[in-house]
Design a protein with these regions (language model features):
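Short, Lys/Arg-enriched N-terminal segments with co-localized hydrophobic residues
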Residues: 2-9
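Short N-terminal binding/cap micro-motifs at the start of the first secondary-structure element
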Residues: 21-26, 60
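Short glycine-aromatic motifs
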Residues: 29-35
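Helix N-cap/beta->alpha junction signal
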Residues: 19-20, 149
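Extreme N-terminal starter segment of soluble prokaryotic enzymes
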Residues: 10-14
Length: 242
């Protein structure tokens, strides 16, 4: 207590994604800036929220985390964004608060903090097609796959801060999509112009890509709603403790 008033600490929450589209509904009215190739959005109410994206893969996720930490340390972090489903029963376009993350490269397992859901997610070094999804499901017992979450989980563990993982399903197990890996640059950025030229002359992919676009939009909306509800519940619990 200082001068007869309570001093309330501001919680600094980081939200790390791969692509701006994943964050769009969440950060629509937030302040945006670009720092060294990383897109950063900030919002302040009673607490401070910082979202960032730098591309696909663990190296890009690490750069995004570093950009968020540039001003000050963070108190908790979310890995956030689109994922593929590894089972048919998972809702395409829906959001999941995962139980934990497995790194397919190292076998490491990271638990999410209290309040997380039931599904496990595996982080792959590549975009998984149907065959790879089936292999990952069998090898790790996970329901979801991404390319970044393990890096964020590891960084959170090193800093001893709470880690959460909220993901939205953009593509189901049986989705027949182009090989996205050939259009991801060394920096993790998706080379959209090359991809458009590729699919423009391959109409067999058009229906599935249209479905994926719509599912991705729904997933982004669902993630924003899930994150907002989760943070409201968490902040309410902390207020009761105080």
């Amino acid at each position: 207590m200082v001068s007869g008033e309570w001093v309330c600490a501001v919680t600094r929450t980081a939200i790390i994604a791969a692509m701006a589209g994943e964050l769009k509904p969440l950060v629509r009215w937030w302040k945006h800036e670009r720092m060294d190739g990383v897109d950063v959005w900030k919002h302040r109410d009673d607490n401070l929220y910082v979202a960032a994206c730098a591309g696909a893969g663990q190296a890009a996720a690490t750069r995004a985390f570093a950009a968020v930490e540039r001003d000050a340390p963070v108190d908790l972090v979310f890995s956030y964004g689109w994922v593929g489903a590894l089972r048919e029963d998972l809702t395409v376009g829906g959001a999941y608060n995962t139980a934990g993350v497995i790194d397919a490269r190292t076998g490491e397992r990271f638990n999410c903090d209290a309040g997380a859901g039931a599904e496990w997610l595996v982080t792959s070094p590549v975009v998984a097609d149907e065959r790879e999804k089936l292999r990952l499901a069998g090898a790790y017992g996970a329901g979801l796959v991404d390319m970044e979450a393990a890096a964020i989980a590891r960084l959170a563990q090193m800093r001893q801060i709470p880690f959460y993982c909220i993901k939205g399903v953009s593509d189901g197990l049986g989705a027949r999509l182009p090989d996205f890996n050939r259009f991801i640059g060394a920096d993790g950025r998706f080379e959209l112009a090359r991809f458009v030229l590729f699919v423009l002359v391959r109409p067999k992919y058009w229906p599935e890509l249209i479905r994926m676009g719509e599912n991705s939009r729904k997933a982004s909306e669902a993630m924003a709603k899930a994150l907002s509800e989760f943070l409201e519940g968490r902040e309410g619990t902390e207020s009761e403790v105080r």
